[in-house]
Amino acid sequence: MSQLLRKPERAEISKGVTLVHDVTADNASLEYVSFKALDLSQGATYSETLENKECCIVVVTGKVHVTDHEVTFENIGTRESVFEKKPTDSVYVSNNQTFSIEAVTGARVALCYAPSKNQLPTKLIKAEDNGVEHRGKGNNQRMVHNILPDSDPSANSLLVVEVFTESGNWSSYPPHKHDRDLLPEESLLEETYYHEVNPKQGFVFQRVYTDDRSLDETMTVENENMVIVPKGYHPVGVPEGYASYYLNVMAGPKRIWKFFNDPAHEWIIE
């Protein structure tokens, strides 16, 4: 199996808490981005102390309480399925803080991490504060929920976004990349994709490739799989009859999202 494609682990790490994914610098070719997905049974609690990283807690589904033991946000989360296609609540927690998550209902949460040195306030990112965009045209259309865009100064390194792509469409397309620290033309950002597919027996295709093809992998990505993008272009194709959701986490040396389209395919938007 590709080193870029990750299947769910589903390991119970404490009572009522199941680790679905755990992407770290130790098990992935990433320097800036880390990611966990957790399933919590109703009433279960998960706690973690951050050291040199910040974290964005995304309530993917269900309802939870989140606290940093100074500030508490209760009953956050807005949906039972991501395919309700409405924004959800998230919480930003800075480095050197401890946070706890208690499940009010059965819940899935995503923990998105990036390096951080400067402490910032814990912040509730309300669903209604997500910027919603509709991008593309033709069979290249998708809806975007901006949870932590680069225009929001709430984080030091993290960029977090949800993308919904309908049946028969492409996203992250035309193929683009952000793997060179070459501003203003391009920024260097690693990225992870957490995928869901509806109906759940479906799949999408994702290709990750570089100009010189030293990296060139095309993957069949199933429901709840992850794809790691250390560098290169990374388009996603959604077959007829299925809908795609993915949660993107990006981070790099500068908190700016500036991508570069593959010149061979940029003509489709000209």
Swiss-Prot record:
Catalytic activity: 5-deoxy-D-glucuronate = 5-dehydro-2-deoxy-D-gluconate
Pathway: Polyol metabolism; myo-inositol degradation into acetyl-CoA; acetyl-CoA from myo-inositol: step 4/7
Membership in a protein family: Belongs to the isomerase IolB family.
Matching Pfam families: KduI (PF04962)
EC number: 5.3.1.30
Record-level Gene Ontology MF annotations: 5-deoxy-D-glucuronate isomerase activity; glucuronate isomerase activity
Originating species: Halalkalibacterium halodurans (strain ATCC BAA-125 / DSM 18197 / FERM 7344 / JCM 9153 / C-125)
Entry's Gene Ontology BP terms: inositol catabolic process
Full protein name: 5-deoxy-glucuronate isomerase
Domain of life: Bacteria
Function (record text): Involved in the isomerization of 5-deoxy-glucuronate (5DG) to 5-dehydro-2-deoxy-D-gluconate (DKG or 2-deoxy-5-keto-D-gluconate).
Keyword set, alphabetical order: Isomerase
